[in-house]
Amino acid sequence: MKAGCSMVEKPEGGGGYQFPDWAYKTESSPGSXXIQLWHFILELLQKEEFRHVIAWQQGEYGEFVIKDPDEVARLWGRRKCKPQMNYDKLSRALRYYYNKRILHKTKGKRFTYKFNFNKLVMPNYPFINIRSSGVVPQSAPPVPTASSRFHFPPLDTHSPTSDVQPGRFSASSLTASGQESSNGTDRKAELSXLEDGSAADWRRGVDLMSSRNAVGGGGISHQKRKPDIMLPLFARPGMYPDPHSPFAVSPIPGRGGVLNVPISPALSLTPTIFSYSPSPGLSPFTSSSCFSFNPEEMKHYLHSQACSVFNYHLSPRTFPRYPGLMVPPLQCQMHPEESTQFSIKLQPPPVGRKNRERVESSEESAPVTVPTMAPIPPRIKVEPASEKDAESLRQSAREKEEHTXEEGTVPSRTIEEEKGTIFARPAAPPIWPSVPISTPSEEPLEVTEDIEDRPGKEPSAPEKKEDALMPPKLRLKRRWNDDPEARELSKSGKFLWNGSGPQGLATAAADA
């Protein structure tokens, strides 16, 4: 393919198309690979004699229908010197173009394809042009050329800076782009109005802000260029009679601008150029000469915002946005005494059930206890070395009561703790009850004496729990194997099986 190839007129065409020499070569012999299938299809489409074989689809841009597939395949085979060509092979070649995005099949229509001219028209390709001729059907699509793809409006002649600095915004580009022809004289009048004193100091302020922006935002790579001459889109806020104006009490008189109208608080006061500026130095509302906010003004401003939202159903997102505006705090500062009144107190986390019981019991015993009481040692659960029966426990509790009564303290805490521990972890019923259940004839004193004589016979709480779960026969066997002292007592006849030998054993098994 040649880059700058000449356009060769097809001698027998007459259809108005001009093909580049890479699409059609008159000197190419049959069978040469000088032409591609889509070039050949375009060639058939431009010929009037093949209108019954292949034609443009009516009403669609770039769409064509193959009316006689076998005839198109025969013509393509003759051109490529392949007599065995049929439509199956040709459609496979067309499917290759699907992946290349040159053309695609139209869904729902048989033998209908559509050229993707956006892909075909490439910058380094010469373009296929269509002449206005009666032979070409009206439905045939005009193949786009480079000039028809992009439309750039001509540069504005009224812009004073367009010749020197074409990349910058001009003063006329701030106005509406749709009024180019009708507003030419208005623009000239606006530019002449720029030369008065107010425009001069506006320009000075703009230059000052641009220099500050260049110093402050030097690290930003994509810095937006600022125009040299700029029209203020909105007049500066002055003495407006509108009661809902946010700046009704502003002492600054209004300046002339393009849109000298009372500004609604829901409109953006920042011009469009400033809205997207990367640094707050571009905004004309950041300088100290524009606004001096006092509490009354802020109150009025917030009230007008609320009115605009509630009365006109506006979204709060349409409020004025000032990119770099730092609102000073209100002057009525609170005294430090008042501010320290409302100190935040962090509450401790809620206590659990056991801690709650301890706190309640300590609160009950607090007013009665002596203030010089020794700190209570931490409760540590220890497995008892020698188990006692219920009576010995009661006796020790009574001794503790007497001891605490002598010291002048109430034993309610110890009793509460005893009850709490008993309630929190109920022990399994003892396997060898100290009091006989089934036989009233036996003396209970003798049994208790015998049991008190042997230390460490009653199992601890986890053992009790295990024994309660296992069957009585296995329990008896384990007890018999683990306790040689019990066997000696039973041999000597001192140990009583819950009162009456086998009967007591049977009742114990029945209870379990």
From Swiss-Prot:
GO terms for biological process: cell differentiation. It is found in: Nucleus. Residues 158-184 have a biased composition (Polar residues). Residues 443-452 have a biased composition (Acidic residues). The modification N6-acetyllysine is found at residue 388. Disulfide bonds: none annotated. There is a cross-link at residues 381, 388 (Glycyl lysine isopeptide (Lys-Gly) (interchain with G-Cter in SUMO2)). Coiled coil: none annotated. It comes from the Eukaryota. GO terms for molecular function: DNA-binding transcription factor activity, RNA polymerase II-specific; sequence-specific DNA binding. Residues 138-196, 341-512 are annotated as: Disordered. Keywords: Acetylation, DNA-binding, Isopeptide bond, Nucleus, Phosphoprotein, Repressor, Transcription, Transcription regulation, Ubl conjugation. Residues 380-406, 453-468, 479-491 have a biased composition (Basic and acidic residues). The keyword Repressor applies. The keyword Cytoplasm does not apply. It holds the Pfam family Ets. SMART domains: ETS (SM00413). Belongs to the ETS family. Transcriptional repressor that contribute to growth arrest during terminal macrophage differentiation by repressing target genes involved in Ras-dependent proliferation. Represses MMP1 promoter activity. This is ETS translocation variant 3. The lineage of its organism: Eukaryota, Metazoa, Chordata, Craniata, Vertebrata.
